[in-house]
């Protein structure tokens, strides 16, 4: 791997296995297509996993956390200390994703890339200390190139741990007060969509707060306008450590051959950056849901993504992706365990 490891080739999809899985679907005891989107979902997983009967026995969930300098502009309904406090909640088992991980029997890891809370040393948390959060991107770049590359590598390292653990599906989650502002800014810069269409309430801003948030993003876009066409520099200028880690994780998963289930708005923006950096990663990215943030729909449309769920979620943490895991597991079970017409001695539709 060279220094720009994220540009290295992604693993190829097993097209022969896709054809075999499609053929199996046609022989199952049901009218063709009657299980709707569950059918192509199982076929796609067969191609990603390289086996006729795919499954998700081993699931890896990584939560990446980091604070954001732009919070100084008053863009969040919650104080910055919440990021550090939630790290303890994750490993203590009290967060939504902690509950979901237990129910799904998933491996859950928590990675702290850099918060404003000094001296955090929590058992069960990987503290990387890239900085006390990012810088205020209205005044300059959110992070240095060195910090950005370290954050990308942190995501890659998590994906490599997932691979070593035998994970068949990777979910990345995020925690960082202010990160919907960062994600909205990145999306605006890369998509060229007006800020007013992308800025949303985040953790609960009122209409006045959303309007202020949009103005802050406008100022940041004007400052960093020269880099708009450069996905990597846009990530470093406007992103968060946890967003960069998600980008790195998604790209490394595609290179190692692990299917990714992308969570909500922030994770989808990370997926957008990943696809812009290395388009070959796209087939490895499945999208769990369409969230309540207004910008999410635009990002999903750009990625030509079909989210599995639409439940009005806006929590983050990887929670929406975790909620979609049973759907993937059931799609695999139906594909792998249903009888064929021949096995069940059921007459097929005449050719």
From Swiss-Prot:
Keywords, ordered alphabetically: Cobalamin biosynthesis, Glycosyltransferase, Transferase
Classification via CDD domains: DMB-PRT_CobT
InterPro entries noted in UniProt: Nict_dMeBzImd_PRibTrfase, Nict_dMeBzImd_PRibTrfase_bact, Nict_dMeBzImd_PRibTrfase_N, Nict_dMeBzImd_PRibTrfase_sf
Gene3D superfamilies, sorted: 1.10.1610.10, 3.40.50.10210
Keyword Glycosyltransferase recorded: yes
Family designation: Belongs to the CobT family.
HAMAP family linked: CobT
Protein name in the entry: Nicotinate-nucleotide--dimethylbenzimidazole phosphoribosyltransferase
Gene this protein is translated from: cobT
């Amino acid at each position: 791997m060279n220094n720009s490891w994220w540009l290295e080739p992604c693993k190829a999809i097993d097209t022969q296995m896709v054809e075999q899985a499609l053929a199996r679907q046609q022989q199952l005891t049901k009218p063709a297509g009657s299980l709707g989107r569950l059918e192509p979902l199982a076929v796609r997983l067969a191609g990603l996993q390289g086996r006729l009967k795919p499954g998700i026995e081993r699931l890896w969930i990584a939560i990446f956390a980091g604070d954001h300098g732009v919070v100084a502009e008053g863009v969040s309904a919650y104080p910055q200390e919440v990021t550090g406090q939630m790290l303890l909640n994750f490993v203590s088992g009290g967060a939504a994703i902690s509950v979901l991980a237990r129910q799904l029997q998933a491996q859950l890891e928590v990675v702290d890339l850099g918060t404003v809370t000094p001296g955090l040393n929590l058992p069960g948390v990987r503290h990387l200390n890239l900085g006390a959060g990012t810088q205020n991107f209205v005044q300059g770049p959110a992070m240095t190139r060195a910090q950005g590359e370290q954050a990308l590598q942190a995501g890659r390292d998590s994906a490599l741990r997932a691979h070593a653990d035998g994970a068949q599906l990777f979910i990345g989650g995020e925690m960082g007060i202010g990160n919907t502002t960062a994600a909205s800014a990145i999306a605006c810069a890369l998509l060229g969509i007006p800020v007013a269409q992308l800025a949303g309430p985040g953790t609960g801003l009122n209409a006045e707060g959303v309007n202020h948030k949009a103005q802050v993003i406008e100022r940041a876009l004007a400052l960093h306008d020269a880099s708009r066409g450069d996905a990597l520099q846009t990530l470093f200028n406007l992103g968060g450590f946890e967003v960069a880690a998600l980008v790195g994780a998604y790209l490394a998963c595609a290179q190692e051959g692990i299917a990714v289930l992308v969570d909500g708005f922030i994770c989808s923006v990370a997926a957008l950056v990943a696809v812009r950096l290395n388009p070959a990663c796209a087939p490895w990215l499945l999208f769990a849901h369409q969230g309540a943030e207004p910008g999410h729909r635009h990002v999903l449309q750009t990625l030509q993504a079909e989210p599995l769920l639409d439940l009005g979620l806006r929590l983050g943490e990887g929670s929406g992706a975790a909620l979609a895991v049973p759907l993937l597991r059931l799609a695999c079970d139906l594909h792998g365990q249903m009888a064929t017409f021949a096995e069940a001695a059921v007459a097929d539709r005449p050719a």
